[in-house]
Amino acid sequence: MYELENVLRPYAWGSTTAIAGLLGRPASGGPEAELWIGAHPDSPSVALSPAGKRAASGSGGAHAAVPDDGGRLALDELIDRDPEHYLGAESVAAFGPRLPFLLKVLAAESPLSLQVHPTPDQARAGFAREEAAGVDRSATERNYKDAFHKPEMIFALTPFEALCGFRPAAESRAVFQLLAADFALAGLELPPLVPQLLEDLAQPDGHNALRTAFERLIAGGTDVSEATAAIVAALVSGAPTAPYQAELSTVVTLHHAYPGDPGVLISLLLNRISLAPGEAVYLPAGNVHAYLHGLGIEVMASSDNVLRGGLTPKFVDVPELLKTVEFEAVAVPMLSPETTMLGQELFRPPFREFQLQRIVLAPGAEPVPLAQSGAAAILVVSGSVLLDSPKGDLQLGHGASAFLPAAEAPVNVHAVSGATGTALAFAVTTALKD
Ligand SMILES: [Zn+2]
């Protein structure tokens, strides 16, 4: 088992305090958006052997170049040395010689871009196409960073606000009807975009209704930006919003962050969700979503393939986006945990690359078997735990994380003797076995 040093991504939307607070360490002073725990080649964790751990004590943060000495090695390089040992034969057969999942701590202070992730076939084909065309992998117009899909899930540690998947067209139409009534009541001229959207959304075929409304908005242009500004001006000056307060206050917030961006009104086509701490949602390919605010544990297939659909100053490839969006109204894909032995919770989304175990250990509690098929990763967000495998022990304090090779299973997670507080940890492994 290897303790890990992980890379912090300082995206501008990140909270400056939430990740440091969760992990019990000093804040960097800048935004701390995502902590990546895994072997994605863009930001691999560093695996520390006992010697490397001593050398690193007191240091922290990201390391671009990792020397292959002193007991420190990038996790992807470690796995490359013996994939079957670290990942297990079954995982290598299913996903190839790479860690199939990525665990993140995500802290959104302001909204992330509206986005969609591709299916496995779309990712493979898109990556091959851009490679063949010689598009630089770091180019702004590059869509596919790797050849893999990126289904994901988010577990809320704090109240967590998000947009997730299309609502039924009739529900979105009702919001635009309310806005039309607000303009009439105030004697304001209705932007022509609104009656056009009402017509789009009235189509009896729900797929067509969502598709035409989405296409009209994502096309952008002055019609969209002027209508957005007029709607926000009406809302700010007190237009009635009931019963769509949450949706319409989100419109105002998004417009302030990204004035006139197509994503501002696209938000009204999507489910507006508020997760309570302990709740989780999963996001399959084709689901249009955006995280708005909150701290969570995010797990995904190890990929960085994102097609953006707005709420971003970054490149938006509309034709490619339209190929990947699923224009179907969906119920919010909430993920209920299975309660396993000793009261532990296991979140199993319908993807084979990952499952998430929430491990709670009160002082003196019985040890908990780690759910593990193939490799696993664990992060301690409260208290301390002792990992006990047939090959040895590893104690992890508050904020520490570790990589657990397949060959070192089974692992039991113990409360640390003498601990006074409850320990809380999150562990990820593949979902190859039932
Ligand atoms: Zn996403």
Residue ranges and their predicted role:
Residues 106-111, 118-120, 148-152, 158-162, ...:
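Ligand-binding loop in jelly-roll beta-barrel domains
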